[in-house]
Regions:
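Internal alpha/beta loop-helix hairpins
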Residues: 1-32
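Non-catalytic connector elements of ABC transporters
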Residues: 19-22, 30-118
Length: 118
């Protein structure tokens, strides 16, 4: 589970897990000091507070899970795994947030940055 919990690089983060980890520039989440931020689809949740404004592009309802491919303003495409009781349709708008403690930070060479919190 260490590869999953603490991927050593962007390369490893990109293929361990299904759906794969979302990778984006740190500036997309207000952290220009972090070259790349990784967020696992299951570490994203719907919120009514502060968060990303998104639009669902493709929704897969799988029973216990709902996989949504969303477009995040100023970030790009992101895949999220939500509880199955959350019903979405293509085109729905929702606000999402990611737990900063669950984010993964990578340096300019793609290596894991230890001791970083968002």
């Amino acid at each position: 589970m260490d590869l999953y919990d603490k991927p050593a690089s962007v390369f490893v983060a990109g293929f361990i897990g299904s759906p794969k980890m979302n990778l984006m520039p740190g500036k997309a989440i207000g952290r220009p000091d972090i070259p790349t931020v990784g967020i696992r689809p299951e570490d994203v949740e719907v919120t009514e507070g502060d968060g990303w404004e998104t639009k669902a592009r493709v929704v897969e309802t799988l029973g216990s899970d709902t996989i949504a491919h969303v477009r995040v303003e100023d970030v790009g495409e992101m895949t999220v795994r939500l509880p199955g009781h959350i019903r979405l349709s293509d085109g729905d708008r929702l606000k999402l947030r990611a737990d900063p403690a669950r984010q993964h930070h990578f340096d300019a060479d793609g290596r894991r940055m230890e001791g970083q919190t968002a």
